[in-house]
Amino acid sequence: MGVPALFRWLSRKYPKIISPVVEDDVTQEIGAAQFSDPNPNGELDNLYLDMNGIVHPCSHPEHKLPPETEDEMFLDVFKYTDRVLLMARPRKVLMIAVDGVAPRAKMNQQRSRRFRSAQDAKIAHEEKERQIRERESRGESIDDAIKGKKSWDSNAITPGTPFMDSLAQALRYWVAYKLATDPGWANLQVIISDATVPGEGEHKLMSFIRSQRSDPEYDPNTKHCIYGLDADLIFLGLATHEPHFRVLREDVFANQSRQMRISDQLSMTQDQKDSIAEQDAKKPFLWLHVNVLREYLEIELYNPHLSFPFDLERAIDDWVFMCFFVGNDFLPHLPSLDVRDNGIDILVNCWKRMLPKLRDYITCDGNLNLESVEKLLSSLSYKEDEIFRKRHEGEKRREENDKRRKLAQEEEKALKNQYIPQVSKGSDKAPLTADINMPLLSTSGDAVEGYAQLSNKDIVENRDVITKANMSNADAAAALKKLLDSKNNKESDKNVSASAAIQEQQNKSDINTTENSKKRPIDQVEAELPKPDENGDSVRMWEPGYRQRYYQSKFGVVSEEEINKIRRDMVRCYLEGISWVLLYYYQGCPSWQWYYPYHYAPFAADFVNINDIIGEQGIKFTLGEPFKPYEQLMSVLPAASGHNLPEVLRILMSDPSSEILDFYPEEFQIDMNGKKMSWQGIALLPFIDENRLLEALEKRYHLLTDDERERNTLKNEVLFISNQNKNYKRFYNELYDNNVKELKFRFSRSSLAGTVIKNEYFVPDGITKFPLSEGDMPDLNNIEFFQSSYKMPTKKMGKSMLINGYISHTRTLTQEDRDSILHGNQRNGGYNRFRTPNDNSGYVNKGPSGKEDYLIYSMRRGGYRAFMHNLKNQNQQHQQPVPMNAMANNSYDNQYNSYSNNNNYNNNYNGGYPNQSNNNYSNQNSYNNYSNQNSYNNYNNQNSYNNYNNRNNHGNYNNYNRYNNQGSNYDRQGQGNASSNRSGYIPAPNRTGNFRNRNGYNR
């Protein structure tokens, strides 16, 4: 998710979440690294690669020359991936995910990026041609290979293109090569989800994690790591509720190299190329520790004034949800919120003030309470006017300081040009020559006519220079040094902050540290320097009436009736959008077809009377089906990138008779929307009409070749294991000897669960050839590894909770860190006033994570452990103790529930989780072990708070949290929520299993 500046903001606000990656040797060749050595960064179980974060920098790097051919790109991908694996060294699972067909909600952003990329490539090509002509006119010789070479089209990194098909083949070969040749990979299970598998790469990875969590044998202490450059990986890591989670990424701010210019490419020597390659190989990487971020959020989000128990998992979900308003890939951010202006902190403060009044959290398991959303945004709306004014004042201050800084640099440069040429060896007696811009003065001090004259202010500021015209060179040099030192001091004191007090203090410092000078009034500065280009901002958010001007300017409407109509529709669509995004993060894609149909977002003040806007029908999504690869290509690519499409489809982009020609404008408007940088502008492209597009493509599908049809087909993930893996013999025998169509396997055996299916492209006794024409890598004997199609376990409702058996990390933050977060290092006699409920008293000397192990987080209301805990306590109060032999298999206080047991749901009895049992956490008589049948009924009749009716293995509970929502029901084509509700909220019947009640919560 593109949230510019988010990573930098997080790392500055929460500094301990970042640590450098320790590398043994980053210059080794492929295959030479000792993958099996202990990891100096700490051991990891599973590594997830968002491959688009590797493919993009390898195929079109910004700081060095791009590879000459696609084969070179793939070899660079191998080398880069091998380096990442050496850092992480996963021991159990490696999943490689490439972006597949995206949901329609993401295609709008992809379309904007690719159209602008094609436009930038065109401008760069024209500039290159101009510079070549200019150099040749000066007599320089330009290599014909450089002149005739076109830049590679990065839009080829889109599902359905020949490049992505070749990338998938290359990755499959490389994984097989590593399994066959690297002993450290012997027990590693590798899943490749290439571009033929629908879904964004990072969300396919999250779906995999959720699917593994749903297995009853899943180890809650699995250590996860995800690699990628997108900021939303941080949110996704939090959304898994897996505290043993890290994010690995390049340190993009270390040794920042400027983007390579065209002139550099035309004149770069081989030594320069080698130097850049050496620097690139040493680029540092960073860990982002999600467990430490959870510690920070636990302190910051804790509110001592709640009328209900503080639940960290639910609070984190609310925090992730609030970050969506600041920026995401599916919706424009609210105008009043920006990461650079601390928009997240502003919204969190509103949330903390409102939460005691809300009486519950805003989100639950990916579902929204829309009434609470309205109250949150209403609290923000009171600040909008002030936010816009302060933002404008800050921008003006920055502009003024930039102007002063630029003018000071120009003055300093002019003074250097005046003094330095006159200071030469052996000419001590030579007088200084007056600058041509200096006024010629008569003996009376009047300026002589016919000479350039400076303003009175310039004369005053330069009077020392004028009066020292006859000084010796030595004196002039000393004067110059003193003046330059003064200028440097002046410049260092001009880092103006947003605080008026600091500004005033710095102004005083300027007066004290400069000789015979003072800060120039800004009106004079503006009069002397060219004015900056106007951004065409007609809204002027900092002035009254901006909301009216916003809708009039952006939508071309005038009447109040039209404005209100657009405003209401935007609010409804935006509410659908935030509901869609939250479900997408926590449960998977709720609808492949939904998208936000506007380029702009409403104001926080517009979110009023939400129930009237939404209506009784609420917010519902229909799952639908993803686009095919060619349908996405036709939706997001400009005509200039049509070469990535089959010829029979490409013609629709440029043929004047094409019925969808209007989808591909060559010129389009960019609305700067009050921003300064071109990349921050909004590309006003027409939205794709899905029906028109599909009808046009359907007429031409029959003209495709067999290879082209193959690229347009959606497929499954592929699983690779070595012949040393413990599942190798079983998979081989069942699929090839016994001809079983598909084979399910559980988590306990190899720390991976799912279903394997025979892969038609894999021949067990065949040969896998090296697919590239460049490079020297061998063909592989298929007997060295095993390849099959792979399906994840059946999807179940994800729960925002820690899984029982989780062993926490040793706490990282100190009391000083807590005070810094709570009080900003300003204790003011209130040392540690608001202690969080989990302080040092919660440590026990127990557990494998260190000398001290933090106690497991308190059980969530509605959680399975809470259910068993309450069941046991009430039986102890009202029933006679049962014999010990009746309690044996269900005692949750004995050694089988210790922290050292990762799977403590009776997994030592009856072979773990018997398939025939409806309740996998105990046997069928577990309730009778606690009480008789009558007391079991009492839990349904007397205690509605703990009325669960748990009908599946993983806790789709019926609880008292009021979250069988009406707002975000989505049609799963029969895969509905399995929970039932007896707490007073009557669900509406729905054949797909969607339930809703009257209180505004969707499920």
From Swiss-Prot:
InterPro entries: 5_3_exoribonuclease (IPR027073), Xrn1_helical (IPR041412), Xrn1_N (IPR004859), Xrn2/3/4 (IPR017151). Residues 107-145, 488-538, 821-847, 874-1003 are annotated as: Disordered. Its EC number is 3.1.13.-. Residues 117-145, 516-534 have a biased composition (Basic and acidic residues). This is 5'-3' exoribonuclease 2. Residues 495-515, 823-843, 971-983, 991-1003 have a biased composition (Polar residues). GO terms for biological process: cleavage in ITS2 between 5.8S rRNA and LSU-rRNA of tricistronic rRNA transcript (SSU-rRNA, 5.8S rRNA, LSU-rRNA); mRNA splicing, via spliceosome; NAD-cap decapping; negative regulation of transcription elongation by RNA polymerase II; nuclear mRNA surveillance; nuclear polyadenylation-dependent rRNA catabolic process; positive regulation of termination of RNA polymerase II transcription; sno(s)RNA processing. GO terms for cellular component: Las1 complex; RNA polymerase II termination complex. Gene3D superfamilies: 1.25.40.1050, 3.40.50.12390. Interacts with RAI1; the interaction is direct, stabilizes RAT1 protein structure and may stimulate its exoribonuclease activity. The interaction also stimulates RAI1 pyrophosphohydrolase activity, probably by recruiting it to mRNA substrates. Pfam families: XRN_M (PF17846), XRN_N (PF03159). It is found in: Nucleus. Belongs to the 5'-3' exonuclease family. XRN2/RAT1 subfamily. Residues 389-419, 690-730 form a coiled coil. Keywords: Coiled coil, Exonuclease, Hydrolase, mRNA processing, Nuclease, Nucleus, rRNA processing, Transcription, Transcription regulation, Transcription termination. Possesses 5'->3' exoribonuclease activity. Required for the processing of nuclear mRNA and rRNA precursors. May promote the termination of transcription by RNA polymerase II. Essential for vegetative cell growth and chromosome segregation. It comes from Debaryomyces hansenii (strain ATCC 36239 / CBS 767 / BCRC 21394 / JCM 1990 / NBRC 0083 / IGC 2968).
